[in-house]
Amino acid sequence: MIKEIIAKHFNLADKNIQLLPKFNIILNKREIIVKEDKCISCGKCIEICPVNAITYSSDGLYITINKEKCVFCGKCKKVCPTNAIVIIRLRCEINEDARIIEVDKYEFIDYISERCASCLVCLRNCPFNAIEEYGSKIRIDINKCELCGKCEEICPLNAIILR
């Protein structure tokens, strides 16, 4: 119903349109670094780390942090007497409003007629009556099809594939 109203008011009646909903994505990234010029290798951070992510470097002069193990709790940063440990938290938020896009439905449906056994189970189960008999095979009416995937789901021979 909404698609029909939009199509009418925006002169899109002859187009296949799809509504993309509003969405929000929040990305969080954390980074932890050791300022080697400030590190005095006191070992306090090694002692307090709850996941043993901090060790001495191979030469023993500085500390290294295994970023795969680190849980970014911040305990090491708090005990560091020289503020050599820096935790960076980056936050990126993407907000997209609802949009209307034109869809070429032929790009999303593959009908492999060689696989089709003409059982018509897809035709009988299509909620939009978008499938019709066509000789000994079927034909999908793109104008009626809503890309719901029911035909793909129910076809026993995988003759209809939605991408």
Swiss-Prot record:
It comes from the Archaea. [4Fe-4S] cluster binds at residues 39, 42, 45, 49, 70, 73, 76, 80, 116, 119, 122, 126, 145, 148, 151, 155. It holds the Pfam family Fer4_10. Residues 30-59, 61-90, 105-136, 136-163 form the 4Fe-4S ferredoxin-type domain. GO terms for molecular function: 4 iron, 4 sulfur cluster binding; metal ion binding; oxidoreductase activity. Keywords: 4Fe-4S, Electron transport, Iron, Iron-sulfur, Metal-binding, Repeat, Transport. This is Uncharacterized polyferredoxin-like protein MJ0514.1. It comes from Methanocaldococcus jannaschii (strain ATCC 43067 / DSM 2661 / JAL-1 / JCM 10045 / NBRC 100440).
